[in-house]
């Protein structure tokens, strides 16, 4: 029976959470702290420690709720072992240097507000004419002063005219204010970054000055939309947690019970902390602080039906009847609650599964069945779930960022971003390097001393041996572990590289050099089997150079008869290109030197037979190893080929490693070459050659055995560990290709492009996803193999420098146990989740930029408005890139949007992509092979949030509704109301666009225009007035109309089309007639953004001239799309009778009053003509159903979706989590017994 090691009291105060290692025996030495990479056992007490850790509080309990860190999510994963866990010898080198996004953490993180979040705010408006005598201070409130009475008293203790609504967001990281009564103070800031100005992103193509839209026109709207898009990715991503034990940070406050205040008697339990002065939504307090009797009466008659606090009927979630969270009715609005609900839906869809997480970890451990050799004494990780009778409530918010969408985002990022491919390749190299660096490396001097020392009497007595040895050492090219690492990383990205052959210079040709040159050439094929399978042209050129050195006549004969190879259509290519082409440029598909030799002379000479045997040996595939993992919930199925199987060395007298067995056949070929050389007189004299070769073969055999140990023990094990990470990230297996000239590529969906009428997309033809050319990242040639063959060996190698290692006659098992324990799978998973979050934000940002440019992200009205007005003109490649950057893609020159520097990327610097498909393609095709469309990369929560934000700002119920149609008239009004419109005229005029000039006898020209006219009858129907009416000026037109209809036409209304093509002379005449109050104007197709203001009549008169000027600007403008800002006034805030001298030139055709809770609080007749509070609209009963949806009950008792029917509801329930349950659950975890090792 195992016992768990207990944490010391001091450990509770540390910021870092140390794992608890279970052991079966107390006499076993405890592993060094902070270095135990074994499976960890985390009892429930750790969760309490996580919550109380100060460093985690600053980041909002990151361990539980932030996508960037999930180590704490293995709370219920436990392992026990009969052995002390080894200290791993290898690990990830530093933190991943992956390309980061500006908002990666912002988009995936969770906020933890200390006060109630809000979207809408109620704002009382003081009356301008209230007597000082009415400013009576409210009654003293002797009880329940906290938390809302002081704030309410400050807002409602003065005389108010009305209570209106505005957007005033209270949310961590977001500043958003949109007030329909003060549009000039509009502000949208996310994480300190303001919504960008479209002027700066259009290169000056569209500005307020040259667009003709005015300062509140199209650029302003586009800027707001961009800000709303940034808000949509962050808003609602919060969790309310009441930090019990820390009074300062608690979000719930207790009410002081006081039965003497009947207005508050129905409020129970505890309240969320709030800024009740900024958000005075607790209307129960109004009867206590206001001096308006009818206002108090309205509140008292209605508000007691609306719950407030924690005492309500919504059942809280619980664990075994323990309260771990509860709903609290608070003063926030249903819109903010809906944003939060959308976030919870996202959390639910990505809910963390311990079973799947354990499967993921177990798919990343070093598997005993995949390690060959003597593994009995080794230890291997194995993860298993512990039995947990009570589900910890904190895990309801634990997520794993993997689903169909994130998988598509990752696949898209791999194909689209060259910067990411390079960054991930570099990180894979760092993982490989952590294992390759475990190699022991000798020097050429060590090798020379080993074979020329006093003890080597045989070698020293053979004088020619020194010449052989010196020639071998001269061929050694310095090769570092970094070189090997970068070369091995090619095995995992072969389809993404466009490699070209490199030349190998062979020196003097003799029997001894044949042995080592053939051996090292075979070694490069063995160490890079995947790379050569994707680049057969490299192998063909390498074999050609070797054969030209040792079989020059034979290879010329073969190529003369069979050619260099054939192309994709089977046509023979006879000549070898003078300049070796790269993979993408190669016109040869199948190479003669890589095929079986069918050409045989009638009497084949010995050298021909050796030549064909050598080709057969070089083309015989060495047995690679495939690391296979099935599909699981958090990863796709992958087959990753590595150069060979990892093998544990078990002493010098064991069987030779597979690669050594394969390579030892080189000695027999070299022996045959020596025999033939003796016959033809190549190289040294016969006696010297025989003596040298005898000693040299012994050395080479020992070097081959040494290489075999290093290859299987270090090189293949490094590849094995890298394969575990590779299979998570990359969308392709690296198995041998069906078409070695096919590259991963990305291409637009042409059918969808045509539907959107997009003709200038940059990726209509597939764009290959290549790595940039890098001379340091290429296969290792034969010269490098000389270095590896002689100088590299494992720490437990039985052979060193071509000689049996007397000091390592048995394996060093403590070192081997530590080495083969492998890299911690949790580290790999952390990198995996970082990449998933990176891909999620990247793919989402790119698609958001795309859908903004096409308008698909917008409502139909906004799409028409912006698509024709700005996007068609300005949304260039540069704007697309800058917009993506605004959304968070990249912050430095090394950003994920940057180009890699490859030739392909240089021709594809346009970042736009609209409907991406991925697949394979060759340079000979213009369509993807195995096309795989990329799905929707935008989170549903972001789409829903953005739709709600657009509706709340620009929709019919929004703060700045965009509507079509307004009229212009200089008629008089005694007072103004928000519902006021210009009176409908009986006659309307539609001007024609053409005109002619008539000349009199004095050759003076007279412009003649034409129009049609309609008479509007009592039913509103339009009846045409005659046919086309000709006129020279407006006064003449009105006289002609009066004659036709039979009565005096007064101020007819002229229709102005959206696309103004009227002659300039006529426009000037219309302006003159309008300013003379002769005609009215109607702009039925022009779009309007409204704002509101309470003004005195004098202020209205001052604003009239500005609107007259705006009418002139509109008529003189020739821009296709218009959007204008019109202010609507109300003068009833000032009581009294005024002369009919006010003119309000611009008024909407269909009036829309601002969102007001109540009006006319101070009127002489106690609210006669005013609007009482509409409790059904602003304070309905909002409940949460079993699925988490918000439902509002209307006056008929019917429950409907709250956000669509009651978007302004100012009291909704929010879920608040507690901490005390974690303490109560302490000690309930019972772990299973799971063996590690044998």
UniProtKB/Swiss-Prot annotation:
Region (Disordered): 1-35
Oligomer status and interactors: Homodecamer; each decamer is made up of two conformers of VP2, called VP2A and VP2B. 12 homodecamers assemble to form an icosahedral capsid.
Subcellular location: Virion
Protein known as: Inner capsid protein VP2
Biased composition (Basic and acidic residues): 7-30
Record flagged with keyword Phosphoprotein: no
More info: Function inferred by structural homology with BTV-fold inner capsid family.
Keywords associated with the record: Capsid protein, Inner capsid protein, T=2 icosahedral capsid protein, Virion
Keyword RNA-binding applies: no
Role played: Inner capsid protein that self-assembles to form an icosahedral capsid with a T=2 symmetry, which consists of 120 copies of VP2, with channels at each of its five-fold vertices. This capsid constitutes the innermost concentric layer of the viral mature particle.
Family per record: Belongs to the turreted BTV-fold inner capsid family.
């Amino acid at each position: 029976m195992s016992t768990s090691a207990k944490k010391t009291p001091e450990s509770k105060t540390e910021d870092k959470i140390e794992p608890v290692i279970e052991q079966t025996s107390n006499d076993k030495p405890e592993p060094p702290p902070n270095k135990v990479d074994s499976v960890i056992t985390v009892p429930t007490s750790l969760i309490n420690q996580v919550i109380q850790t100060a460093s985690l509080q600053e980041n909002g309990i990151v361990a539980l709720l932030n996508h960037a860190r999930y180590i704490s999510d293995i709370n219920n994963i436990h392992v026990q072992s009969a052995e002390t866990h080894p200290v791993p010898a290898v690990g990830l080198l530093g933190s991943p240097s992956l390309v980061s996004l500006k908002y990666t953490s912002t988009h995936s993180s969770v906020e933890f507000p200390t006060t109630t979040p809000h979207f809408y705010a109620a704002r009382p408006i003081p009356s301008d004419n209230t007597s000082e005598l009415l400013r009576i201070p409210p009654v003293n409130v002797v009880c329940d002063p906290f938390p809302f009475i002081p704030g309410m008293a400050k807002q409602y203790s003065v005389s108010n005219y009305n209570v209106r609504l505005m957007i005033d967001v209270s949310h961590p990281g977001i500043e958003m204010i949109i007030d329909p009564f003060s549009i000039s103070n509009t502000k949208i800031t996310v994480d300190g970054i303001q919504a960008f100005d479209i002027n700066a992103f259009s290169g000056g193509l569209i500005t307020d000055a040259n667009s003709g839209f005015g300062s509140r026109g199209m650029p302003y709207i586009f800027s707001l939309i961009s800000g709303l898009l940034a808000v949509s990715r962050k808003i609602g991503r919060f969790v309310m947690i009441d930090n019990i034990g820390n009074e300062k940070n608690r979000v719930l406050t207790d009410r002081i019970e006081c039965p003497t205040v009947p207005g508050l008697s129905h409020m129970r339990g505890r309240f969320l902390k709030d800024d009740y002065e900024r958000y005075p939504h607790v209307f129960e307090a109004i009867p206590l602080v206001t001096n308006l009797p009818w206002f108090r009466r309205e509140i008292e008659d209605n508000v007691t039906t609306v719950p407030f606090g924690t005492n309500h009927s919504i059942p809280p979630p619980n664990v075994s009847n323990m309260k771990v969270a509860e709903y609290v009715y608070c003063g926030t609005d249903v819109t903010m609650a809906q944003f939060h609900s959308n976030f919870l839906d996202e959390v639910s869809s990505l809910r963390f599964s311990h079973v799947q997480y354990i499967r993921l970890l177990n798919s990343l451990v070093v598997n005993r069945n995949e390690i060959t050799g003597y593994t009995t004494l080794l230890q291997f990780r194995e993860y298993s779930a512990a039995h947990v009778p009570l589900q910890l409530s904190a895990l309801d918010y634990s997520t794993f960022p993997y689903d169909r969408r994130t998988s598509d985002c990752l696949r898209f990022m791999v194909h689209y971003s060259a910067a990411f491919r390079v960054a991930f390749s570099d990180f894979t190299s760092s993982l490989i390097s952590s294992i390759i660096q475990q190699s022991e490396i000798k020097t050429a001097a060590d090798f020379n001393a080993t074979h020329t020392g006093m003890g080597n009497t045989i070698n020293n007595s053979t004088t020619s041996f020194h010449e052989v040895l010196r020639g071998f050492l001269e061929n050694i090219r310095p090769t570092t572990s970094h070189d090997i690492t970068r070369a091995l990383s090619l095995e995992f990205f072969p389809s993404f590289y466009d490699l070209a052959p490199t030349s190998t210079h062979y020196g003097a040709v003799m029997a001894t050099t044949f042995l080592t040159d053939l051996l090292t050439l075979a070694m490069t094929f063995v160490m890079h089997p995947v790379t050569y399978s994707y680049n057969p042209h490299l192998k063909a050129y390498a074999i050609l150079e070797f054969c030209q050195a040792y079989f020059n006549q034979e290879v010329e004969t073969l190529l003369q008869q069979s050619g260099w190879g054939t192309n994709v259509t089977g046509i023979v290519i006879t000549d070898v290109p003078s300049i070796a082409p790269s993979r993408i440029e190669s016109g040869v598909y199948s190479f003669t030197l890589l095929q079986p030799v069918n050409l045989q002379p009638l009497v084949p000479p010995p050298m021909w037979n050796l030549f064909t045997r050598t080709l057969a040996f070089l083309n015989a595939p060495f047995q690679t190893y495939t690391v296979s993992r099935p599909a699981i919930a958090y990863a796709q199925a992958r087959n990753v080929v590595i150069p060979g199987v990892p093998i544990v060395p078990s002493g010098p007298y064991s069987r030779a490693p597979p690669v050594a067995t394969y390579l030892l056949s080189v000695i027999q070929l070299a022996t045959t070459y020596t025999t033939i050389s003796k016959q033809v007189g190549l190289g040294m004299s016969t006696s010297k050659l025989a003596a040298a070769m005898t000693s040299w073969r012994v050395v080479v055999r020992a070097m081959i055995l040494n290489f075999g140990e290093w290859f299987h023990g270090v090189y293949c094990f490094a590849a094995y560990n890298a394969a575990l990470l590779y299979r998570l990230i990359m969308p392709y297996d690296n198995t041998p290709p069906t078409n070695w000239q096919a590259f991963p590529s990305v291409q637009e969906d042409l059918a969808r492009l045509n539907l959107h009428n997009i003709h200038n997309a940059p990726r209509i033809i597939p764009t290959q996803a290549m790595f940039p050319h890098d001379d340091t990242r290429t296969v290792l040639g034969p010269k490098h193999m000389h270095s590896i063959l002689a100088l590299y060996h494992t720490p437990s190698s039985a052979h060193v420098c071509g000689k049996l290692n007397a000091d390592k006659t048995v394996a060093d098992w403590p070192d081997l146990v530590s080495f083969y324990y492998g890299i911690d799978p949790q580290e790999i998973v952390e990198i995996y989740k970082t990449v998933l979050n990176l891909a999620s934000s990247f793919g989402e940002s790119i698609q958001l930029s795309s859908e903004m440019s096409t308008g698909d992200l917008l409502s139909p009205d906004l799409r028409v408005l912006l698509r024709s007005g700005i996007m068609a003109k300005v949304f260039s490649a540069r704007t697309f890139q800058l917009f993506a950057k605004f959304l968070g893609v990249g912050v430095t020159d090394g950003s994920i949007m940057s180009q890699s520097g490859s030739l392909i990327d240089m021709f594809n610097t346009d970042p736009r992509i609209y409907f991406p498909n991925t697949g394979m393609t060759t340079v000979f095709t213009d369509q993807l092979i195995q096309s795989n469309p990329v799905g929707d990369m935008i989170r549903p929560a972001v789409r829903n949030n953005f739709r709600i934000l657009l509706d709340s700002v620009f929709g019919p119920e929004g703060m700045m509704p965009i509507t079509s149609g307004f009229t212009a008239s200089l008629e008089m009004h005694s007072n103004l109301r928000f519902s006021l419109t210009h009176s409908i005229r009986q006659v309307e005029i539609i001007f024609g666009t053409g005109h002619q000039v008539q000349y009199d006898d004095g050759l003076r020209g007279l412009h003649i225009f034409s129009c049609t006219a309609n008479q509007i009858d009592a039913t509103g129907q339009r009846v045409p007035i005659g046919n086309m009416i000709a006129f020279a000026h407006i006064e003449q037109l009105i006289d002609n109309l009066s004659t036709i209809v039979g009565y005096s036409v007064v101020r007819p209304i002229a229709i102005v089309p959206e696309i103004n093509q009227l002659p300039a002379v006529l426009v000037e005449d219309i302006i003159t007639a309008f300013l003379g109050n002769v005609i009215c104007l109607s702009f039925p197709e022009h779009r309007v953004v409204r704002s509101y203001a309470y003004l005195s009549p004098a202020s209205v008169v001052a604003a009239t001239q500005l609107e007259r000027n705006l009418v002139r600007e509109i008529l003189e403008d020739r821009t296709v799309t218009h959007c204008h800002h019109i202010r609507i006034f109300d003068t009833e805030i000032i009581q009294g009778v005024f002369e009919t001298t006010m003119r309000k030139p611009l008024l909407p055709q269909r009036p829309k009053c601002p969102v007001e809770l109540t009006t006319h609080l101070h009127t002489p007749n106690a609210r006669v003509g005013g609007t009482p509070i509409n409790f059904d609209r602003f304070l309905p009963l909002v409940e949460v159903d079993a699925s988490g949806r918000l439902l509002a009950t209307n006056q008929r008792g019917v429950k409907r979706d709250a956000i669509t029917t009651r978007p302004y509801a100012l009291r909704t329930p929010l879920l608040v989590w507690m901490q005390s349950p974690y303490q109560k659950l302490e000690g309930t975890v019972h772990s299973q017994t799971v063996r590690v090792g044998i």
